[in-house]
C-alpha cells in the first residue's frame, strides 16, 4: 500500500514539474507584443523599396522575375512577396 502511494505521489510530482517546465518554455518563446510589430513594418517597407528599385533597374532590359529579394522574398508585380 505504501509503495503504491509513493508511486502515485512521485508521478504527480513529476507531472507538475514537467507541466511547469513546459509552460516556462512556452512563455520564453512567445513574441513581445509592442516592439516586433514596428520592426516588421520597417522590414516590410525596406523590402518593398528594395524590390521596387531592383525591378525598375531590371525592367529596362529584362523582366523582374529572375531578380530575387533577400531573405526568402521574391520580386513579383514590382513588390516583394514571401516565398
From Swiss-Prot:
Expressed by the venom gland. Residues 1-21 form the signal peptide. Its main location: secreted. Residues 22-48 form a propeptide. PROSITE patterns: HWTX_2. Transmembrane segments: none annotated. Disulfide bonds join 51-64, 55-75, 69-80. It is found in: Secreted. Pfam families: Toxin_20. Lethal neurotoxin that blocks neuromuscular transmission. Belongs to the neurotoxin 12 (Hwtx-2) family. 02 (Hwtx-2) subfamily. This is U1-theraphotoxin-Hs1f. It comes from Cyriopagopus schmidti (Chinese bird spider). The lineage of its organism: Eukaryota, Metazoa, Ecdysozoa, Arthropoda, Chelicerata.
